């Protein structure tokens, strides 16, 4: 019998992460991510004035990656937002959740909405070849590309199409323990770095505390991920976000870079771009991961005119060489 609270309290043992094409069925403890919930009659109205997405148009069976910005249009965080129970929930990086929630709550005293962290739920990733078939043995209904959110018996299941089909499971400790018991010998286990690696490959921006309030949403490709509504009403930071679109003020984009490096850069580090015989500091690292084969993957915000021909390196790592990889979507204005 699996201890009910094992997955809830402890991350799975860390294994070197793999690219989606090499990944066997794997359950992933998402301890580096955290959940928050919002309930109450004013929740939609309140969220509508705080985030970049059109919350009133979010169907029960959809999730969306949107941004919560400051007055200058810089993102406190990005949020994976979805319907959950009687209200909404969102997932973000754990290391900035408390700071982001304090910003989100600033004006909530005037609204009938309750915003709270939720550490009772267990967040698990499920990815790798054949993972749908394995999950289908444990859940009677699974989300898919047409209906990316399913709520079932208190569990909320999210579907992601990229970089390959994967799922994010919001479970009770009991449901998590039951799933582990049922699938235990059929899946590998890994920690948050595997999910982070898949997010890098999918071009899904990862905002940690080091990069909070540093970037407008478009600098992290949020418009290309349909995370910004340009037709909804006012929200905090809207003027700057709209200006970036209509006046062409945004000159940056999010990139996936891959190659060799002696060190894995940290969130907030800069990179160096080769210009002839010289190197120039550029960009900001959002996240990075070293794979099982030794390759280093980096997600970074850089000038939006880079191409696959550009050569970059980790700062002050003369032997490193990383280049732009194709994302599974087109970067739009």
Swiss-Prot record:
Q: What SUPFAM superfamilies does the record tag this protein with?
A: Aminomethyltransferase beta-barrel domain, Folate-binding domain
UniProt keyword tRNA processing, yes or no: yes
- Residue ranges annotated as transmembrane are none
Protein family (similarity comment) = Belongs to the tRNA-modifying YgfZ family.
Coiled-coil regions listed in the entry: none
Function (record text): Folate-binding protein involved in regulating the level of ATP-DnaA and in the modification of some tRNAs. It is probably a key factor in regulatory networks that act via tRNA modification, such as initiation of chromosomal replication.
Location in the cell: Cytoplasm
Binding of folate occurs at 33, 195
- Species of origin: Pectobacterium carotovorum subsp. carotovorum (strain PC1)
Q: Name one GO molecular function term.
A: folic acid binding
The UniProt entry, under InterPro entries, shows: GcvT/YgfZ_C (IPR029043), tRNA-modifying_YgfZ (IPR023758), YgfZ/GcvT (IPR045179), YgfZ/GcvT_CS (IPR017703), YgfZ_barrel (IPR048451)
- How is this protein annotated for GO cellular component? cytoplasm
Q: What is the protein name for this chain? A: tRNA-modifying protein YgfZ
Q: Which NCBIfam families match?
A: PRK09559.1 (NF007110), ygfZ_signature (TIGR03317)
Its BP terms in the Gene Ontology are: iron-sulfur cluster assembly; RNA modification; tRNA processing
Q: Which domain of life is it from?
A: Bacteria
Pfam families reported in the protein's UniProt record: YgfZ_barrel
List UniProt keywords, sorted A-Z: Cytoplasm, Folate-binding, tRNA processing
């Amino acid at each position: 019998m699996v201890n009910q609270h094992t997955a809830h309290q402890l991350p799975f043992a860390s294994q070197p992460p793999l690219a989606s094409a090499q990944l066997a069925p794997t359950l992933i403890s998402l301890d580096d991510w955290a959940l928050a919930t919002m309930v109450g009659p004013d929740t939609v109205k309140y969220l509508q004035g705080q985030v970049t997405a059109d919350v009133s148009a979010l169907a029960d069976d959809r999730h969306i990656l949107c941004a919560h910005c400051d007055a200058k249009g810089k993102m406190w965080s990005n949020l994976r937002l979805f319907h959950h129970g009687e209200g909404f929930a969102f997932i973000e990086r754990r290391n900035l959740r408390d700071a982001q929630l304090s910003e989100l709550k600033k004006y909530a005293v005037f609204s009938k909405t309750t915003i709270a962290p939720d550490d009772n739920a267990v967040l698990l990733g499920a990815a790798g070849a054949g993972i749908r078939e394995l999950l289908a043995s444990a859940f009677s209904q699974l989300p898919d590309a047409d209906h990316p959110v399913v709520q079932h018996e208190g569990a909320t299941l999210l579907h992601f199409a990229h970089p390959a089909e994967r799922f994010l499971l919001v479970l009770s400790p009991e449901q998590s323990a039951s799933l582990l018991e049922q699938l235990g010998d059929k899946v590998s286990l890994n920690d948050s770095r595997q999910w982070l690696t898949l997010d890098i490959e999918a071009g899904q921006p990862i905002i940690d505390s080091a990069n909070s309030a540093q970037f407008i949403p478009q600098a992290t490709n949020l418009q290309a991920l349909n995370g910004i509504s340009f037709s909804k009403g006012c929200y905090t930071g809207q003027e700057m976000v709209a200006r970036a679109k209509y006046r062409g003020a945004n000159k940056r984009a999010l990139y996936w870079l891959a190659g060799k490096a002696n060190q894995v850069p940290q969130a907030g580090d800069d990179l160096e771009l080769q210009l002839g015989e010289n190197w120039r500091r550029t960009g900001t690292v959002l996240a990075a991961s070293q794979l099982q084969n030794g390759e280093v993957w980096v997600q970074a915000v850089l000038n939006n005119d880079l191409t696959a021909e550009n050569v970059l390196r980790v700062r002050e790592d003369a032997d490193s060489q990383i280049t732009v990889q194709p994302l599974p979507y087109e970067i739009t204005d």
